[in-house]
Amino acid sequence: MSDHQPIQHLVKVTPENGLHLAPIAQLVRTATAYGSAISLSFDGKRADVKSAFDLMLLGAPCGAELTLDVNGPDAPAAAAAITQLFESGFSQHP
């Protein structure tokens, strides 16, 4: 079961209002489609990306760099999907 490698890299918050309700909803919806553990860290705080409450508590403003950590059997696909949301500025429609 330890065949998978954890993935870690930086993502940048680009929405003008930071991580607010709409991007958080997209993150949670995307993350829950994967079995991997997915978290974001910012300013000494860590959030489970499958929890809207955790993500709200991060308080990440526009321009913030967050550390994305993904660990699990589908980590590469999960990391790619979450990264795509950040890179697109959350412009994808659900």
Where are these regions (language model features)?
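A common structural junction motif
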Residues: 84-92
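Amphipathic, hydrophobic secondary-structure cores in small proteins
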Residues: 21, 25-81
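Flexible, glycine/charged-enriched surface loops at secondary-structure junctions
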Residues: 3, 93
